[in-house]
Amino acid sequence: FAAPFVSGGLAVIADYFEGQLGSKEIVDRLFATANKNGVYSDKAIYGQGLMDLGAATAPVGQVSAMLTGTLSGAMVPALFTGIQLTSPSFGDAVSNGVANQTIIFFDELDAPFRGAVENLTTDYRNQIVNLDGYEHMYQSTPQIIDSPDNVLEMSNYKNQNLSYGLISSMHLLEAQQDSNQFFTYFNKGNNSFVSHGINGSWALGIFQDKDLRYKSQLRSQFSNPWLNFSAGGTSFGSVYKFQHNLDVAFLISSGRNRFQANEVFGESNSSTVAMIELQPKNNMPSIQFGVLKENDSNLGLSGSGAFNGNGGQMTSFVGISDSISLFGGKFFSSLYVGNSPGTSNNEGMINSITDIQSSAFGMGFLKQSIFNSGDELLLSIDQPMRTESGEMNLRVPVYRTKERSVLFNSFGFTLRPSGREVHSKARYTSSFKNIGLSLTLGYKSDPYHIKSMEDYWYTALGFSIKI
């Protein structure tokens, strides 16, 4: 190296790393990253080789994230470090909370590389494809076999092979199709039921009412939201007569998270739910009590790498629901609230998560035989599961001194999203002989619980012909 060029290169490296490297580290880095290939390998002429500032300011080897407070402590690959959201309940809370926050990772020479914490978060809305108004592209074709002893329902979605010029890739629509394949079975003799690939509360809550049980369009709005975390698996349940005016239902469900709306890229997090439902027979609402155990997340909020540490999270919940005959139709409603106890972590960058309260609610009205014996009107309004309170506290490295000490930034933020999604929908269906028609009109405010997202209307018109 020529002395003036070396001096200039050292200054560039020192400035690039914000003065965090000592003089010896800078010189060692300059020599270690010099180009020693070809003619530059001749030490008699080029000494340490050709200075390469591009290589000197780029990571050397693997970039790692700290698990402890020192550079000599345990580290994990930065590539595997991040925060994932596989539930819509947090909305934009995490992305807002980490906005403008930075973090440093380290290469194999312990040089710091700065990045944005926000780039390490995977937002739920970036994992999904919005199919509102496109349900008719994959028409549900449930087959219900109803006998005196039992009821069997099997469903999948039939690809209509229509070209709508959607921005969304077709493979994501195919993934959405796969996620709607399920079966349910109800034994009328002993009041037991089993299902796979669907929220396990399909026969509980408002769905005790046989007029509502197989209204598949209501399931995503009125099923117990915590059972969505195991809806990709199998559920077993049974209803027992406890007293002459009280039945008690028991349910166990285990499987992966239904919120993996992007099945192509989503992780497979498994959860288990145990639930009891009290079913009074004196026109009183049903009450549900239950516990959700998630293996690798907290209500779908999970961390990996240096953000790991939320395994085995428990959530308790309670729900109340009812359906009554009113104005010649059925009025139905449900309300659910849950609590996830706080957690702390001695290693990693998530210091703690406080208690998280969450909620969901909905109400609707079903009226049949309005203009003819084969039509019905279904009105509903609901709020999907939403985080009502809770905080996350992070401790991330932001600076290292020339003496190799690491300085941390501790900060916390609310897990309550900026908005509250409310979904209103009206659906009219009618049939004449072998032809069926349906018209859906819906409105969403604060989609995904994000205030900055525009409210929108959607509509869908469909028809079917029985051959």
Identify the function of each model-found stretch.
Residues 213-217, 221-226, 249-251, 264-268, ...:
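Outer membrane beta-barrel transmembrane domains
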Residues 115-235:
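Transmembrane beta-barrel domains of Gram-negative outer membranes and organellar outer membranes
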Residues 182-186, 236-240, 274-282, 318-324, ...:
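Residues on the lipid-exposed face of transmembrane beta-strands in outer-membrane beta-barrel proteins
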Residues 1-48:
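Hydrolase catalytic cores
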Residues 219-223, 233-238, 244-279, 291:
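Glycine- and small hydrophobic-enriched segments that form the cores of compact globular domains
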Residues 447-467:
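Proline-poor, low-complexity alpha-helical tail modules
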Residues 54-154:
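Secreted peptidase-domain scaffold signal
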Residues 160-162, 180, 190-194, 242-248, ...:
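Outer-envelope beta-barrel architecture signal
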